[in-house]
Swiss-Prot record:
This is Putative RING-H2 finger protein ATL53. GO terms for molecular function: transferase activity; zinc ion binding. One of its GO terms (cellular component) is membrane. It comes from Arabidopsis thaliana. Pfam families: zf-RING_2. The lineage of its organism: Eukaryota, Viridiplantae, Streptophyta, Embryophyta, Tracheophyta. GO terms for biological process: protein ubiquitination. It catalyses: S-ubiquitinyl-[E2 ubiquitin-conjugating enzyme]-L-cysteine + [acceptor protein]-L-lysine = [E2 ubiquitin-conjugating enzyme]-L-cysteine + N(6)-ubiquitinyl-[acceptor protein]-L-lysine. Disulfide bonds: none annotated.
Length: 310
């Protein structure tokens, strides 16, 4: 068979769109053979298994470590939030307490007025020593029919009524009366009267052996007045007859008398005439008048409380 010397001459008779001839062309790709270099698709489960097996860093130990760190981070964030919230509450509470204290300190500022003024105000944070508090006079309340009565019927600190045989303490200058327990607790952190804010000045000099303090009672006026009764010693319940007369035409307060007596450890008992400072027995009692009430004083060294009974 003789070959055609010019095969290109046949090409002009070949129709590239005719796929029946079995020729590979653009119009007949089914007769073309291609080499596919891409791997076949795999399932999702096979992909996960192959990924874990091919990556040794994602072991259970690594996952556990990441879990521990995540838990620690969450706990630290929770602790930070709780601490911040509690700190804000504490700050707000301290600010409110400071606001109330500022009001008290502003009212009780020592710069307001003269310090020697009996109604001078000072800071409530300055308290008195126990020794100074104990130097303030006190007495036991006695209520009898037609007897003496003190001004006021209750304690301004605890708002409790004064009952018989209760120990009451009389503040100097303002002469306000309070329960001993209540006012002692107040004076440990304050140096003024809780009712009128008058500054409390306790005498530091040694007191006389015999000292009679007259507490404020119901006020009355009379040109000639008298009061008689028995002074009862609180410690040993001893009675001393006392007669008080006044010919001074002025206002004054009848009162329970706290008589503090001690001379070489012995109590003195007898009849006393306090008119014009005359003595009927043992001691000379002097009388003086002040705006706070009648004050009777004698010479002495230590104190013991006594009360007047009608």
């Amino acid at each position: 068979m003789e070959s055609d010397p010019n095969p290109s001459a046949w090409n002009q008779y070949i129709n590239p769109r005719d796929c029946t001839q079995g020729l590979c062309s653009t119009f007949c790709p089914q007769w073309c053979t291609y080499i596919n270099f891409s791997p076949p698709p795999i399932s999702y489960e096979q992909f996960l298994n192959d990924g874990v097996a091919s990556n040794p860093n994602l072991s259970p130990l690594v996952i556990a470590i990441f879990g521990i760190f995540a838990t620690a981070f969450l706990l630290a964030a929770y602790y930070t939030l709780v601490s911040k919230y509690c700190a804000n509450d504490t700050t707000n509470e301290a600010a409110s307490e400071s606001g109330r204290s500022d009001i008290i300190l502003d009212v009780n500022s020592p710069e307001r007025g003269d310090q020697d003024d009996p109604f001078a105000l000072e800071s409530s944070t300055a308290g008195l020593d126990d020794t100074l508090i104990k130097k303030i006079g006190f007495f036991k309340l006695k209520k009898h029919q037609n007897g003496f009565k003190i001004n006021g019927t209750d304690c301004s600190i605890c708002l409790g009524e004064f009952n018989e045989d209760e120990s009451l303490r009389l503040l100097p200058k303002c002469n306000h009366t309070f329960h001993v327990v209540c006012i002692d607790r107040w004076l440990k952190s304050h140096s003024n009267c809780p009712l009128c804010r008058a500054k409390i000045i306790v005498p530091t000099t040694q007191q006389p052996e015999h000292h009679v303090v007259v507490m404020n009672l119901d006020r009355f006026t009379s040109n000639v007045g008298s009061a008689e009764g028995n002074v009862v010693v609180d410690d040993h319940r001893e009675e001393v007859s006392v007669s008080i007369s006044s010919h001074h035409p002025s206002w004054f307060s009848a009162a329970d008398i706290v008589l503090r007596i001690s001379r070489d450890g012995e109590e003195e008992e007898g009849n006393y005439d306090l008119e014009n400072g005359n003595r009927e027995k043992l001691v000379d009692l002097k009388r003086s008048f002040s705006s706070g009430g009648l004050v009777l004083g004698t010479q002495g060294r230590t104190r013991r409380s006594l009360n007047i009974c009608p």
